[in-house]
UniProtKB/Swiss-Prot annotation:
Residues 30-40 have a biased composition (Acidic residues). It comes from Phyllomedusa sauvagei. InterPro entries: Dermaseptin_dom, Frog_antimicrobial_propeptide, FSAP. GO terms for biological process: defense response to bacterium; defense response to fungus; innate immune response; killing of cells of another organism. This is Dermaseptin-S13.
């Protein structure tokens, strides 16, 4: 009977240890995914700001060109 109790205790203990290891790995994977998502959103924000800045510059150049053309006539 004592042998069965020890065996059962050992099985339960090893099960708990493996569950805690799996939970830890799962949390690490979720953290990595969240970090990748943050990096991607930062890249998108940077890309959007660059596109916006390029559009502003192009608009100013086009407006200047139109003003120059209107001034020549």
């Amino acid at each position: 009977m004592a042998f069965l109790k020890k065996s059962l205790f050992l099985v339960l203990f090893l099960g708990l240890v493996s569950l805690s290891i799996c939970d830890e790995e799962k949390r690490e994977n979720e953290d990595e995914e969240n970090q990748e998502d943050d990096e991607q959103s930062e890249m998108r924000r940077g890309l959007r700001s660059k596109i916006k800045e390029a559009a502003k510059t192009a608009g100013k150049m086009a407006l200047g060109f139109v003003n120059d053309m209107a001034g020549e006539q």
